[in-house]
């Protein structure tokens, strides 16, 4: 699958939001002027149309999870067929991707790094190696680092960073054994209020 290979901080400036594409050792503000969009006229504040707002919100969420357009649209279609609120269903599907869960557990400092661990067969789900990042994790699933990868310095370093952050309440994390469990369904209040999923649903509903 194709992936974005350009400057990651440029994407954060484009969306005027920290997309957590870089390790969390330093704040995004110390790395770039996030309030200034990229380009010659990035400092200009433009009044966006309703469509432009919807498009920017979709791009922000898509880039946050590192997903290309076609796959993101497929998540929307799947979310719209589930019972309940389509916007919340979309967020749940994205949050329960294996690469995101590995990132949330702290095995990787970014979702991209978590994806690399999965591709390199360093991650198990219920004691079986899973090598595709889009794998949908279910409640009560156990996610762990395979034995041969537990000595990787980047995983150990990432876990040290994770210990300093607030732990997701929907996950249990066993640092010594490098494993965690997906405890419960993710509620809307669990996630950032900076995300406006309603704008995305409005965009796709046209």
Curated annotation (Swiss-Prot):
It holds the Pfam family S4. Keywords: Ribonucleoprotein, Ribosomal protein, RNA-binding, rRNA-binding. It comes from Buchnera aphidicola subsp. Cinara cedri (strain Cc). The keyword Ribosomal protein applies. SMART domains: Ribosomal_S4 (SM01390), S4 (SM00363). InterPro entries: Ribosomal_uS4, Ribosomal_uS4_bac-type, Ribosomal_uS4_CS, Ribosomal_uS4_N, S4_RNA-bd, S4_RNA-bd_sf. Part of the 30S ribosomal subunit. Contacts protein S5. The interaction surface between S4 and S5 is involved in control of translational fidelity. Residues 96-156 form the S4 RNA-binding domain. SUPFAM superfamilies: Alpha-L RNA-binding motif. This is Small ribosomal subunit protein uS4. GO terms for cellular component: small ribosomal subunit. One of the primary rRNA binding proteins, it binds directly to 16S rRNA where it nucleates assembly of the body of the 30S subunit. The keyword rRNA-binding applies. Belongs to the universal ribosomal protein uS4 family. One of its GO terms (molecular function) is rRNA binding. GO terms for biological process: ribosomal small subunit biogenesis; translation. PANTHER family: 30S 40S RIBOSOMAL PROTEIN (PTHR11831), SMALL RIBOSOMAL SUBUNIT PROTEIN US4M (PTHR11831:SF4).
